[in-house]
Structure formats: C-alpha cells, structure tokens
Regions:
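Exposed, low-structure sequence patches enriched in small/polar residues
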Residues: 1-288
C-alpha cells in the first residue's frame, strides 16, 4: 500500500523596498546638471502582485546628465554656439540565487568562498552590469558674418556636430559586449542675398505694356542658395560569450561587426532670371 502526501505550508513572503532620488542643479543659462538614482530590492512589487510576480533580484541604477553651453564661457563678441551634452548611467542587477547553481542563494555561494578575490570574481560573473556613456556637441557654429554682404568664407556658413556613444554589458552568459558609435557632421550653407540685376530698367523709361517684359527683365548672376552636407558615421560592435562549463576559458570565438559610412549631399537653387528656375540635388553614400 502506497500513501503519497504533498503538503504545502506557506510561501517565502519576504517583502522588499524601493527608493528613488533626483538632484537638479541649474547654473543660470550656462549649464544644467541632473543626478538621479533608483534602487529596488528582492521582494519588491505592487500591492496587487503575487509572490511570483515580485522582483527576484536587487536592482541599482544611477545616472549623471550635463548640458553645457560652452559658448557662454567665451566673450560675447565671439558669438559662438556650442551646446555640449554628456551623460553617464550604470545599471547593476544582483541575482537572489546563484545563476551557476540556481538552488543556492547568492549569499550562501559567497559565504562558501574563503578568499575575497574569489567572491569578487563570482560577483563579476553573476551580476548583470550595463554602462552607458554619451557625449555630443550639436550645432557648433559662429553666429557672426561680415558687416557687408554675406561672403562664401564666413564662419557663420559652417555648422558642425559630433557625437560619441559607448554601451558596455556584462553578465552570466556574456563576458563582455561593447557597442561604440561615432558620428560627425559638417554642413555648409551659403545664401549670397544679392539683388536681381535689371539692366534695361534704367534705359527704358516708357511704361508701355509692350516693353514691360524687356524693362522688367532681371538676371541673378549668383545662386540663391548653396548647401553642402558631409556625414561620417562609424560603429564597432564586439561580443565575447562566457563558457559556463569552464569559467576560466576565454577561447570562445569573438564576434564583432564594424561599419564606416560617409554620406555627402549637395543642393543648389538658382533662378537665373525671373522666369527661369533651376534646382539641383545630388547625394553620394559610400562605405569605407
């Protein structure tokens, strides 16, 4: 006679906590600094969530964001616009149970290691860490032109931008994952602003409608607008997976990808006369 009994006493109903903080510093019209932090511990969840739906790990996040108008650091006569942006953020997820032995709590796995170096090594493997860094200069330009008519060589005709972003990820199955991006833009925009030349207007005084076409005939010797844009973008991606059978083995193949693109465009708008309108656009996309 077999008598099987399955008895369920209770759930591990330990609660967790969460906290969030934010600090914002405004330095007049020069800069803005924002610092934020967020934390959630094991067992935290909404009131209506069941035990299985609550967080089963510890989450820690913090970030620093800065906006700076570097042109404000120079004399006003320079008339430089240089918006600078920088951000740094990090997210760390600490598991409740050892991912290498899911029946053992992480605290017990760490207590079983005698050396501090061994405990640090286990944390580096089991913790999921994501780090983001971003830096950009958007729309850097001089707002000054010559006192007379706009000239092709005026610094105000040029606008440049630069951006760099790095994302680094590591965890139990990933030794390292790196994603880096660069972007550089250089734009040139020139509008001569030259008046239309009407060579016959001063010669023909008659208001006759028959001579109106000749009298009002106008020539634009220069284009109305010339626009050039050059864009360089580069991306590098690298992935090194972790050998869970042999944690010290770093011979797994490295996966990587790289792109380097150079895109150029030209736009020309020219009305040689009042009756003739000319527009030209050209673009080139190249992979380096």
């Amino acid at each position: 006679v077999w008598a099987n009994e399955l008895r369920l006493q209770d759930f591990a109903n330990k609660g967790g906590w969460a906290a969030q903080s934010q600090l914002n510093v405004q330095l007049a019209d020069l800069a803005n600094i924002n610092v934020s932090g967020h934390a959630e511990t094991n067992g935290f969840g909404d009131l209506e969530e069941t035990v299985s739906q609550r967080r089963d790990d510890d989450l820690y996040q913090y970030s620093v964001t800065t906006n700076l108008d570097a042109g404000k650091l120079l004399p006003a006569e320079v008339k430089l616009t240089a918006p600078i942006y920088y951000s740094y953020s990090k997210e760390v997820i600490v598991p409740r149970y050892n991912p290498l032995d899911t029946d053992m709590p992480m605290s017990d796995a760490l207590d079983a290691l005698p050396l501090r170096s061994q405990r640090d090594s286990l944390r580096n493997i089991t913790n999921h860490v994501v780090t983001n860094k971003n830096f950009s200069v958007s729309g850097l330009r001089f707002n000054r032109t010559t006192q007379s008519a706009p000239m092709p060589y005026d610094l105000g005709n040029f606008t440049t931008s630069f951006a760099h972003a790095v994302r680094h990820t590591s965890g139990t199955t990933t030794a390292r994952e790196i994603d880096m991006n660069w972007k550089f833009d250089l734009a040139y925009n020139y509008s001569p602003g030259m008046r239309t030349v009407e060579p016959f207007k001063s010669l023909i005084k008659s208001r006759s409608p028959w001579l109106r076409i000749v009298r009002d005939f106008g020539i634009n010797p220069l284009p109305q607008n010339l626009s050039l844009l050059s864009n360089l973008s580069r991306r590098y991606y690298e992935l090194q997976e972790r050998d869970l059978e042999q944690l010290d083995n770093k011979s797994l193949p490295l996966s990587f990808a790289s792109d380097f693109l150079w895109n150029r465009s030209l736009q020309l708008r020219w009305d040689p006369t009042k009756q003739i309108h000319f527009s030209f656009m050209s673009g080139t996309d190249a992979e380096i």
